[in-house]
Amino acid sequence: MSKTIVRKNESIDDALRRFKRAVSKTGTLQEVRKREFYEKPSVRRKKKSEAARKRK
């Protein structure tokens, strides 16, 4: 879990910007979106192979 402590003389907007950057850097939001709904293992494998094919 990401924590952001508001510094002295720092606006809430700046602290929120730092927090959002930290969350996106750790990939927390993407992980939540990925796990929002159950995905069968066969579907997961299919998506993984399609992504690999798309990268090449």
Swiss-Prot record:
Q: Which InterPro entries does the record match to this protein?
A: Ribosomal_bS21 (IPR001911), Ribosomal_bS21_CS (IPR018278), Ribosomal_bS21_sf (IPR038380)
KW Hydrolase (keyword) present: no
Q: Which GO terms describe its cellular component?
A: ribonucleoprotein complex; ribosome
Gene Ontology molecular function, alphabetical: structural constituent of ribosome
Listed GO biological process terms: translation
**One Pfam family matching this protein:** Ribosomal_S21
Keyword set for this entry? Ribonucleoprotein, Ribosomal protein
Lineage: superkingdom: Bacteria
Q: Which HAMAP family match?
A: Ribosomal_bS21
Q: Which family does it belong to?
A: Belongs to the bacterial ribosomal protein bS21 family.
- This chain belongs to the protein called Small ribosomal subunit protein bS21
- What species was this sequence derived from? Geobacillus stearothermophilus (Bacillus stearothermophilus)
- Gene that codes for this? rpsU
